């Protein structure tokens, strides 16, 4: 699972996701990619599940780049605990995604194989995405 080695603050505020991605919106490594169409949080488990789905479909062919990293901790209170009494304990890590951000890139495979692998990966993610190709 992806997670930061060291963080300055153990707990952070949720923040707001407004506007579109300023960076990371073009294909830098591969020929094909998966681009976000809406904003949201993607957990480290979802990133890993999508990566596994892609690699299993292409059967060790081609190369895959993960363009996002979960650097924001999210907290969760235990089950059946009343409201209040402070913020919960850190539960995991999320990547903040804005529209236009490239999530994954692929190269070394045909368009049909890449499109199907990226479609399988998109089903593992909680946001709407589209498949893009280098023109």
Swiss-Prot record:
Pfam (any one): Ribosomal_L16
Keywords: Ribonucleoprotein, Ribosomal protein, RNA-binding, rRNA-binding, tRNA-binding
Entry superkingdom: Bacteria
Any GO BP: translation
Record GO terms (molecular function): rRNA binding; structural constituent of ribosome; tRNA binding
Matching Gene3D superfamilies: Ribosomal protein L10e/L16 (3.90.1170.10)
GO cellular component, one term: cytosolic large ribosomal subunit
Subunit organization: Part of the 50S ribosomal subunit.
Physiological role: Binds 23S rRNA and is also seen to make contacts with the A and possibly P site tRNAs.
Similarity annotation: Belongs to the universal ribosomal protein uL16 family.
Protein name: Large ribosomal subunit protein uL16
Annotated organism of origin: Desulfatibacillum aliphaticivorans
